């Protein structure tokens, strides 16, 4: 999974007015990486309008609806570190991982990210690091 995380797709020390702005940033990063078309950003917002992608432990994983499969060009991940947090419905997200999975890979990606974030120590390291390499190391050490 760490092969999908490039330093260019890890954004440290971000701040956002609201979850919609964070979704736009995550979606645009996926567009810029060549993983999705622009349509995918709206699909991420559409999913969020139906069901929150907040997973607990300060983590939100916005991703597109099933109808947006055609907007996914290749699997991709982007991570936004938000030390001060952003309001996400009734919760506060400190890490937002935007995902796009090709050929059903999104379920595997969701599972691996959720497992990594189930450990409070991993969450703390990701929220507080100043290095993209450290974030990748957390996922590698979680061995997911």
From Swiss-Prot:
Pfam families (UniProt xref): PTS_EIIA_2 (PF00359)
The active site consists of: 63 (tele-phosphohistidine intermediate)
The subcellular location is: Cytoplasm
The record places domain PTS EIIA type-2 at 3-142
The molecular function GO annotations come to: kinase activity; protein-phosphocysteine-sugar phosphotransferase activity
Assembly, per entry: Homodimer or homotrimer. Seems to be a monomer when not phosphorylated.
Function, as annotated, reads:
The phosphoenolpyruvate-dependent sugar phosphotransferase system (sugar PTS), a major carbohydrate active transport system, catalyzes the phosphorylation of incoming sugar substrates concomitantly with their translocation across the cell membrane. The enzyme II CmtAB PTS system is involved in D-mannitol transport.
Q: What is this protein called?
A: Mannitol-specific phosphotransferase enzyme IIA component
Which gene codes for it? mtlF
